[in-house]
Amino acid sequence: PEIRGKRYDDAKHKRAMVLMSNSDILFFHLLFAGFATLFGACVGSFLNVCIYRIPRDESVIAPRSHCPHCNTLIPWYLNIPVLSWLCLRGRCAACKGPIAFRYTLVELLTGMLFLAVFMKWAAPAALHMPPIAQPLMIPVYWLFLAGLVLGTFVDFEHFIIPDSVTIGGMAVGPLLSALVPALHGQDLWWQGLRSSGIGLLAGFGLLYAVGWIGTRAFKKESMGFGDVKLMGAIGAFLGWKAVLFTIFASSLLGSVAGLLLI
């Protein structure tokens, strides 16, 4: 009986240790998920600076954040992502001028995108990847999505896509693909670089061809060159399959939007 009792206690102790271990894993997973969201919101705050200043050829580093109406410098405690806009009810604390909801939208969107990337690549399903690849995938996708957010909102307001997003993406994509070949489902650096190069050429070439055909058919420019460079950057980061999916999805969404506007 004593032996059976000891075995029972050992089994009970092991179950308790497993439950504690799972609780610790869940705690740290939620902790880092919260950090990813907050970090994304902070990156979104910086992207707002870039969205406002890059089209105006202003430095994104200096001067500090200021009100676009009265140029009053914004102190750090009034520059907290999302919360400051809500507390100030979308108005400058100094001149009461309106602050566009776009600032909060960019911060929220970037925070949610960063969280989604973390939840994707920190999940148990991603553990089959090489140990060094898994943590590196997260910042690479964060950088890629930050560039897309920047390019999207600048294009929405000014109908241009900054070269820092397009040309920068085409330059950085192959380098990061060589560093993290798992980005393209590869194991060796040269395989990742090759896949990135194929994706870049596919994205740039396909959209350039579509634009060239459209210009000849309609006798006017049918597509901006910024879109061509952006597709090249997408291919450099995600490969040729992502290029085909992006072209198909954007065409489908464009068709749906056109039908709704008729």
Where are the language model's segments positioned?
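Short, strongly hydrophobic alpha-helical membrane anchors
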Residues: 12-29
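Functional transmembrane core segments of multi-pass inner-membrane proteins
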Residues: 36, 128-133, 137-258
